[in-house]
Curated annotation (Swiss-Prot):
<feature type="compositionally biased region" description="Basic and acidic residues">
    <location>
        <begin position="115"/>
        <end position="127"/>
    </location>
</feature>
<feature type="compositionally biased region" description="Low complexity">
    <location>
        <begin position="481"/>
        <end position="498"/>
    </location>
</feature>
<feature type="compositionally biased region" description="Low complexity">
    <location>
        <begin position="460"/>
        <end position="474"/>
    </location>
</feature>
<protein>
    <recommendedName>
        <fullName>Uncharacterized protein MAL13P1.336</fullName>
    </recommendedName>
</protein>
<feature type="compositionally biased region" description="Polar residues">
    <location>
        <begin position="591"/>
        <end position="602"/>
    </location>
</feature>
<feature type="compositionally biased region" description="Polar residues">
    <location>
        <begin position="308"/>
        <end position="331"/>
    </location>
</feature>
<feature type="compositionally biased region" description="Polar residues">
    <location>
        <begin position="263"/>
        <end position="276"/>
    </location>
</feature>
<feature type="compositionally biased region" description="Polar residues">
    <location>
        <begin position="520"/>
        <end position="530"/>
    </location>
</feature>
<keyword id="KW-0175">Coiled coil</keyword>
<feature type="compositionally biased region" description="Low complexity">
    <location>
        <begin position="617"/>
        <end position="656"/>
    </location>
</feature>
<feature type="compositionally biased region" description="Low complexity">
    <location>
        <begin position="531"/>
        <end position="590"/>
    </location>
</feature>
<feature type="region of interest" description="Disordered">
    <location>
        <begin position="78"/>
        <end position="220"/>
    </location>
</feature>
<feature type="region of interest" description="Disordered">
    <location>
        <begin position="459"/>
        <end position="657"/>
    </location>
</feature>
<feature type="compositionally biased region" description="Low complexity">
    <location>
        <begin position="190"/>
        <end position="215"/>
    </location>
</feature>
<feature type="coiled-coil region">
    <location>
        <begin position="86"/>
        <end position="139"/>
    </location>
</feature>
<feature type="region of interest" description="Disordered">
    <location>
        <begin position="251"/>
        <end position="280"/>
    </location>
</feature>
<feature type="compositionally biased region" description="Low complexity">
    <location>
        <begin position="297"/>
        <end position="307"/>
    </location>
</feature>
């Protein structure tokens, strides 16, 4: 053995003596260990080291392995376990860094490599023995035919208690690598090809044959077991495992009745004539009829129109809650006030948060037969004003009789009068001021020689009439709802806008540049939720009232005279001063396209300025804009942003309609007008 030599002369002799003693002891242990086969077997099971792990270990750096077997038989001279990590006591520490060739520490692992190779050879010999035993076992299987009549192929009889069979049985019990010899004892396999009705009989015959031959069951089984075709291979017992295995199959006494079929309510659909389904939106029609379930079919006795009952039978409970409301707009030509009368009963604070069933997009949902009878339209309004469902039927019948005699007198109804009063957008307390504003040369009036004109360009006024919020409860794009006096012939001013708004695709107007395009001015929002209460198709909302009651027309027209917006607390410009709004900053933005813009000193200077609060959080268009809950006018914000204060006379005041498609175009034009005010041209279209 090569070991580190110590320079010190005193220690050199001692090291040499220790090496000689170790070599002698190793030779003795080699001779003894070669004769012990038990150690070889134990090493085969316990030592799993190879050369690639042992090479590289030196005297000073060993592998910490607890070796069992030969190393434990070395006696007292062998070092203790883990000694490979311990350094030999040397006084000269300077030469510890110098190491010779790395070899196995024979002191800790004597003759380890030789013993491992011997173990490998012995294991290979054992495998050869097992292979021979496997061949012998196969011969036994061929000679022993267990379940036949007891004769093998050569005509010799075999006894189940013979040594050959017992050896095979013992071998299969302890050898896990050998295949299970139950394969030839699977009675279920032999009976699978037979009819299922004969399985038990065939199994009993096989068992009787085995018992008569005194062979018995080779593997310890119960002789009275019943084997069926559903027991898994290799299992014993009477429990079936196949698809016919159920925990318990019983009957309930008495037999339970069959489940009831789902209830289908086709009452509403039966009221839809087939000739009118073609041109209408079927989806919204079906949802509207399902929401308007009939309360009493006798309501239709006094009407030739069968679908009137489903329109009038809106549950009042839904009106008085924050839940879904059925806002009914019947005929395209009969612009009645059902939405307003429904929402009169809405509680404050709940209306804006609720998802309202919007039936406004369908021109003729409930009034399916297109009955151009104002009385049938007003029946819905009167029904919405009923707080007691018990009085609903009588009141409907009375109203049908009364309204047939008074077809043109819509404003005599209390509900219609109250709704026309609600159309005064902010429950205005000072109607004289509003009328004075209407008479002051079409919303232009002079104060301190400054010309003020309300336009669609107001940015500094909070709570404007139209909201850009998605969950807004105002009518979506209140288009030309209040035409005003003498404007009955201008019914088609917004047809182009309505056609564009009827399209279902989302044009992504808001997603381009919110601050420049949408919030730059207050325009309609085509991407607003479809669940909002909108008045999209009410092109001629109050023209029915214009025929008879001019006073109510004045009230409705005043909504638009106030700059075409819902100023709420700013119903007249005098109130603007009272609300801490400076005239120049508030109204200076209204001079962008007006004649006489130069007459308002410093007006256009504040055109695109925001106050400090609005610079931080653009609340002007996002907080409570047109939220009718604050003013008890839940649905009264129906201003006209396209038909401005001139009632369709666009040549007046150079004030043109503004659509959301025209925002960029008009914005560039307005910027040019700031630098170069346009000349007065009354003939400009």
């Amino acid at each position: 053995m090569e070991d580190k030599e110590v320079v010190n002369s005193e220690n050199k002799v001692e090291v040499i003596k220790e090496e000689e003693n170790i070599k002698k002891e190793d030779d003795v242990t080699k001779k003894v260990s070669e004769n012990t086969e038990d150690n070889d077997i134990s090493l085969a099971n316990n030592v799993s080291l190879g050369k690639h792990l042992l090479i590289g270990s030196s005297l000073k750096k060993g592998i910490s392995v607890s070796v069992r077997g030969r190393t434990m038989n070395l006696g007292m001279n062998a070092k203790q376990a883990g000694s490979a990590w311990k350094k030999k006591e040397t006084e000269n520490v300077e030469e510890e860094g110098e190491e010779k060739e790395k070899k196995i520490d024979d002191e800790s692992f004597p003759d380890l490599l030789e013993s491992t190779e011997k173990m490998k050879s012995e294991l290979s010999k054992e495998k050869d023995k097992k292979k021979k035993q496997l061949k012998d076992g196969k011969k036994v299987e061929d000679n022993v035919n267990v379940f036949n009549s007891g004769f093998d192929r050569g005509g010799k009889t075999t006894d189940g208690n013979s040594t050959e069979f017992n050896d095979k049985k013992k071998y299969n019990m302890y050898d896990g690598n050998k295949k299970n010899d139950n394969a030839f004892n699977k009675k279920w396999y032999n009976n699978q090809q037979n009819d299922m009705n004969n399985n038990n009989q065939n199994n009993q015959n096989n068992m009787n044959n085995n018992n008569n031959n005194n062979n018995g069951h080779i593997f310890d089984t119960n002789e009275s077991e019943e084997v069926t075709g559903y027991i898994l291979p290799g299992f014993k017992g009477k429990h079936m495992v196949g698809f016919t295995c159920f925990l318990k199959r019983g009957t309930q006494n008495p037999v339970p009745p069959p489940p009831a079929p789902p209830l289908t309510n086709n009452q509403g659909e039966n009221n839809i004539p087939t000739d009118n389904r073609n041109n209408e939106n079927k989806k919204l029609m079906n949802t509207n009829i399902k929401m308007n379930q009939q309360v009493d079919n006798n309501n239709n006795n006094n009407n030739n129109n069968n679908n009137l009952g489903s329109a009038m039978n809106t549950p009042m409970n839904n009106m008085n809650k924050g839940g879904p409301r059925n806002n009914v707009n019947n005929s395209e030509h009969m612009r009645e006030h059902s939405n307003h009368t429904v929402n009169r009963f809405a509680p404050m604070g709940q209306y804006a948060n609720s998802k309202n069933n919007n039936m406004n997009n369908v021109h003729n949902v409930n009034n399916v037969n297109n009955v151009n009878n104002v009385n049938n339209v007003n029946n819905v309004n009167n029904m919405n004003n009923m707080n007691n469902m018990n009085n609903m039927n009588n009141n409907m019948n009375n109203m049908n009789n009364n309204m047939n005699n008074n077809m043109n007198n819509m404003n005599n109804m209390n509900s219609m009068n109250s709704m026309n009063n609600m159309n005064n957008m902010n429950s205005m307390n000072n109607m004289n001021n509003m009328n004075n504003m209407n008479n002051n040369n079409n919303n232009k009036f002079n104060e301190n020689n400054i010309l003020y004109k309300g336009t669609n360009y107001n940015r500094n006024v909070k709570n404007l009439g139209q909201n850009n919020n998605e969950g807004n409860t105002n009518m979506k794009h209140g288009h030309n709802n209040n035409r005003g006096q003498g404007n009955n012939n201008n019914n088609n001013n917004n047809n182009n806008f309505n056609r564009r708004n009827d399209k279902n695709d989302n044009r992504n107007f808001r997603r381009k540049d919110i601050d420049l395009e949408i919030n730059w001015r207050n325009t309609a929002n085509p991407t607003q939720e479809e669940n909002n209460n909108n008045m999209n198709h009410n092109n001629n909302y109050n023209n029915n009232n214009n025929n008879n009651n001019n006073n109510n027309n004045n009230n409705n027209n005043n909504n638009n005279t106030n700059h075409g917006k819902n100023f709420r607390n700013f119903n007249n410009l005098n109130n603007m001063k009272n609300n801490n709004s400076s005239n120049n900053k508030m109204m200076g933005m209204n001079h962008m396209q007006q004649k006489g813009m130069n007459s308002s000193t410093g007006g256009h200077k504040y055109s695109f300025n925001k106050n400090d609060d609005q610079k931080n959080n653009n609340k002007m268009y996002k907080n409570n804009m047109g939220n009718a809950n604050n003013n008890n006018n839940n649905n009264a914000v129906n201003t006209n942003f396209n038909n401005n204060n001139n009632n369709g006379n666009f040549h007046m005041n150079n004030n043109k309609s503004i659509n959301s498609m025209d925002v960029k175009k008009t914005r560039m034009k307005d910027i040019r007008n700031l630098n170069d005010p346009p000349k007065v041209n009354n003939n400009e279209a």
